[in-house]
Amino acid sequence: MSVFLAVDHVHQVFDLPGGGQYIALKDVSLNIRPGEFISLIGHSGCGKSTLLNLIAGLAQPSSGGIILEGRQVTEPGPDRMVVFQNYSLLPWRTVRQNIALAVDSVLHDRNRTERRTIIEETIDLVGLRAAADKYPHEISGGMKQRVAIARGLAIRPKLLLLDEPFGALDALTRGNLQEQLMRICQEAGVTAVMVTHDVDEALLLSDRVVMLTNGPAAQIGQILEVDFPRPRQRLEMMETPHYYDLRNELINFLQQQRRAKRRAKAAAPAPAVAASQQKTVRLGFLPGNDCAPLAIAQELGLFQDLGLSVELQSFLTWEALEDSIRLGQLEGALMMAAQPLAMTMGLGGHRPFAIATPLTVSRNGGAIALSRRYLNAGVRSLEDLCQFLAATPQRLRLAIPDPIAMPALLLRYWLASAGLNPEQDVELVGMSPYEMVEALKAGDIDGFAAGEMRIALAVQAGAAYVLATDLDIWAGHPEKVLGLPEAWLQVNPETAIALCSALLKAGELCDDPRQRDRIVEVLQQPQYLGSAAGTVLQRYFDFGLGDEPTQILRFNQFHVDQANYPNPLEGTWLLTQLCRWGLTPLPKNRQELLDRVYRRDIYEAAIAAVGFPLITPSQRGFELFDAVPFDPDSPLRYLEQFEIKAPIQVAPIPLATSA
């Protein structure tokens, strides 16, 4: 359906009297369809009324825009009508005269008879015929609000804006007016946006409920689709379990935001913190292509230029790296994309340990390789693999670096898309990337999913060929991220910004083909890729099929297309996959978890420090290769459509404290 109203990357900043600024709204985007009823909810100070005023044209956004039917909103207009909590009726005019004032002012191009007809029809529409000639002091509060709504509808607006219209009314009157408003909007075909604190009101009236995060810098945290058919009956809705599922979703979001506000207040650093922030930082990594920005920032002095002394420590396994983080032997690390989420939740029976990621360091860069004997058997595609496995009782033994590693998650997704159950039809073996090539040569495994370094070495040795790259499954996926302990980040935010700034500059160099020789020279040092650097960083990718190597653009992605943005939308997808394969329940408190892990504020400060433009990716979903749409606001619905999955559980997850 076409877009009627678009809120396009809106920022709203207010200057403070004593200097400084207050960021009310930050990068808010929303598309509204014709005839849709949208409710905005969130705690006080989250910018609900600010957003409503921007849509009304009563204020202009600091950046971004409001687009109504293809035209930018720059001022109030008769196509929009605002109904406030206070009725704003003229006390010396009757109900009819208050409505007529709006009609005569706006619809002055209509003749007198037409205007009178509109007034009388509107009086009947809101059920005020008996009170048409009464003055405001002669009618109840509920009737006054109906007059305000009638005045709004009488000018035939395309968009009705309501700012807590029933907040001051008693429960009975409020309930009656809610049902009347629902009927009126449906009969008139009006598009409506309403601010409310009442979750039951939002569910009754809305097609979608937009949940805003805490201010300052409020954003859209989640959008809930209310899929009850219309016309709606309150009691019928409340008798269904689905109603309470939706209600709990709203309340859960608000509770998470309340906890986030308390946590932010408790974690606010003392004014003297900046001067005493740590400048010597130990960072861990596993050698591979993904460590290129880390190596470049270190060897070209980008960390040092920003006053940092960085010590890099390499590890053979992800378990060893995680142990060093937990023991306080590292201040941060180049981590698997899902690792900050997993550590903060305490996956694998570990104690929850809060990790934040302010930067995605690399994207893509992996593949799925099989032993060459399967190439000789004619396995050149996923379909071929399915046919081969159907004809033999053999189960493939496929090595993965870690159950939560992106190569493992993409491998599972890829297999399941063809009807292969990764828990039954193949055997997944956890293995250090260092061991994979030799294990394949020895016949201990039939293939593996890993980064380009291991793939290239296996192909060069004549032991493997590539069946698929991760670009074939999810182009642009997050691969490695900068992970920092939350407790350390709270007292060293400026150091974290400097780390990110250096890595941003390094990522830009790594994505510049003119810098290839320079990068090879750095990475061929023994602590990084060593002698394998020349093979791994060759310009063309060898699939091991006997064909000429192929150039694959963005096989490794370190900078272009907002590659470094720490995207909570991608984090939601990661949570669905961890849940899909039984590694964790789908967290009911996922918004709280995502807000803690994905530190976009640090990223944005680093972007500003480096001077790169701040361009945020879309936050409204995506598809992998199988074209199954992923909606970040409905992760459970996304999971339920897959036939191959572990039993799905949804539960609140106890999160780590910062200490």
From Swiss-Prot:
Compartments reported by the entry = Cell inner membrane
Q: Where is this region: Linker?
A: 255-278
Consequence of gene loss (knockout):
Mutant is unable to grow on nitrate, but grows normally with nitrite or ammonium as the nitrogen source.
Where mainly found?
membrane
Bilayer topology reads: Peripheral membrane protein
Catalyzed chemical reaction(s)? nitrate(out) + ATP + H2O = nitrate(in) + ADP + phosphate + H(+)
What's a GO biological-process term for it? nitrate assimilation
List each copy of the ABC transporter domain by range.
5-239
Give the UniProt keywords, A-Z.
Answer: ATP-binding, Cell inner membrane, Cell membrane, Ion transport, Membrane, Nitrate assimilation, Nucleotide-binding, Translocase, Transport
* GO MF, one annotated term: ABC-type nitrate transporter activity
Q: What is its EC number?
A: 7.3.2.4
Q: What does its activity-regulation comment describe?
A: Transport is inhibited by ammonium. The C-terminal domain of NrtC is involved in the ammonium-promoted inhibition of the nitrate/nitrite transporter.
Q: One Pfam family this chain carries? A: NMT1_2
Q: Which GO terms describe its cellular component?
A: plasma membrane
Region NrtA-like: what ranges?
A: 279-659
Residues annotated to bind ATP = G42, H43, S44, G45, C46, G47, K48, S49
**How does this polypeptide assemble, per the annotation?**
The complex is composed of two ATP-binding proteins (NrtC and NrtD), two transmembrane proteins (NrtB) and a solute-binding protein (NrtA).
What's this chain's function?
Part of the ABC transporter complex NrtABCD involved in nitrate uptake. The complex is probably also involved in nitrite transport. Probably responsible for energy coupling to the transport system.
Domains: what does the record tell us? Contains an ATP-binding N-terminal domain and a NrtA-like C-terminal domain, which are connected by a segment containing an abundance of glutamine, alanine and positively charged amino acids. The N-terminal domain is required for activity and the C-terminal domain is involved in regulation of the activity.
The family assignment reads:
Belongs to the ABC transporter superfamily. Nitrate/nitrite/cyanate uptake transporter (NitT) (TC 3.A.1.16) family.
Q: What is this protein called?
A: Nitrate import ATP-binding protein NrtC
Species of the source? Synechococcus elongatus (strain ATCC 33912 / PCC 7942 / FACHB-805) (Anacystis nidulans R2)
Organism classification, top ranks?
Answer: Bacteria, Bacillati, Cyanobacteriota, Cyanophyceae, Synechococcales
